[in-house]
């Protein structure tokens, strides 16, 4: 799955100075939709594919805005649960007797979002520049695979959705901060944390998706003024960003439906089996000069 979040830091991306073509826009939007919810690093794949086939990074702001499409897919797929959380939270705010699980879930998501917002704002220059290095992305793709394997081995995977606590939310919220590093995967970080905490795979995955909504939507909306401004130097035009967001929405919805079925009966170690050779391949391409760091 944003997974990595380019977060609030992605708003101004001075590196993108040339317009990208429509083929690149569509391809990257499909990649965004496919990889946003899989624990294989969406931002890492976008950077790698863009550099490999078009010789340039499409930019953090392109990623942040197109992510709005994939997050819209989350809103539609989990519309019932989201509505229950929103109405339950407001009901609990104004009436103490109505403070049930949805009220607590609302606060869990709010509190768990705070760390990634703070780090996203404070570390925006680091996110835009130093961390968007292909060697870092390749290394993290490999190293974080070990975390997946350990989470699967050590996690008891027995706690259900209604057993989530504020402690779980805070820990998964801190894990979400790892998504600032391309190659980690936002979903990979939060789901792994959930497994270590003993949550069932499908529970950790579902909460990971819900937890991403405020941060990723905030990131994309924060980036909109700069992304659509003619003088912003963004790689894609307003029309390309709009179409790309719609494509990411459709592909993202399909990806969510598939992943929720997959995790019910399959280990996340399968994704580690993909990430390790992918990271090694990127390192080889870098060493051969076929990719720019």
Curated annotation (Swiss-Prot):
Name where it's found.
Answer: Cell membrane
An example Pfam family from this entry, by short name, is BacA
Can you state which reaction this protein catalyses? di-trans,octa-cis-undecaprenyl diphosphate + H2O = di-trans,octa-cis-undecaprenyl phosphate + phosphate + H(+)
Source organism, top-level taxon: Bacteria
As for membrane topology, the entry says: Multi-pass membrane protein
Transmembrane residue ranges: 74-94, 107-127, 134-154, 209-229, 243-263, 271-291
What are the annotated GO cellular component locations?
A: plasma membrane
Per the record, the major location class is membrane
Q: Which GO terms describe its biological process?
A: cell wall organization; peptidoglycan biosynthetic process; regulation of cell shape; response to antibiotic
* Entry GO MF terms: undecaprenyl-diphosphatase activity
Q: What is its EC number?
A: 3.6.1.27
What keywords tag this UniProt record?
Antibiotic resistance, Cell membrane, Cell shape, Cell wall biogenesis/degradation, Hydrolase, Membrane, Peptidoglycan synthesis, Transmembrane, Transmembrane helix
Q: What else is known?
A: Bacitracin is thought to be involved in the inhibition of peptidoglycan synthesis by sequestering undecaprenyl diphosphate, thereby reducing the pool of lipid carrier available.
What family does the database annotate?
Belongs to the UppP family.
Q: What's this chain's function? A: Catalyzes the dephosphorylation of undecaprenyl diphosphate (UPP). Confers resistance to bacitracin.
What this protein is called in its record is: Undecaprenyl-diphosphatase
């Amino acid at each position: 799955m944003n997974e990595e979040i380019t977060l609030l830091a992605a708003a101004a991306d001075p590196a993108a100075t040339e317009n990208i073509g429509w083929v690149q826009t569509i391809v990257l939007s499909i990649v965004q939709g496919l990889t946003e919810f899989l624990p294989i690093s969406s931002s890492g794949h976008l950077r790698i594919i863009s550099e490999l086939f078009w010789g340039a990074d499409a930019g953090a702001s392109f990623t942040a805005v197109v992510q709005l499409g994939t997050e819209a897919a989350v809103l539609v797929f989990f519309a019932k649960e989201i509505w229950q959380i929103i109405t339950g939270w407001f009901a609990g705010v104004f009436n103490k007797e109505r403070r049930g699980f949805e009220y607590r879930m609302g606060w869990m998501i709010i509190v768990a979002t705070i760390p990634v917002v703070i780090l996203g704002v404070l570390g925006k220059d680091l996110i835009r520049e130093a961390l968007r290095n292909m060697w870092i992305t390749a290394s993290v793709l490999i190293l974080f695979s070990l975390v997946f394997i350990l989470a699967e081995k050590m996690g008891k995977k027995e706690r259900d959705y209604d057993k989530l606590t504020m402690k779980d939310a805070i820990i998964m919220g801190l894990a979400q901060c790892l998504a600032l590093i391309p190659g980690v995967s936002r979903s990979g970080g939060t789901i792994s944390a959930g497994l270590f905490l003993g949550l069932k795979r499908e529970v950790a995955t579902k909460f990971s998706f819900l937890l991403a909504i405020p941060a990723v939507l905030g990131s994309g909306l924060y980036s909109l003024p700069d992304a659509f401004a003619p003088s912003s130097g963004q790689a894609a035009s307003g029309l390309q960003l709009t179409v790309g967001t719609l494509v990411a929405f459709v592909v993202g919805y399909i990806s969510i439906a598939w992943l929720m079925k997959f995790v019910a009966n399959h280990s996340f170690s399968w994704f580690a089996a993909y990430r390790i050779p992918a990271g090694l391949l990127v390192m080889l391409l870098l060493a051969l000069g076929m990719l720019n760091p």
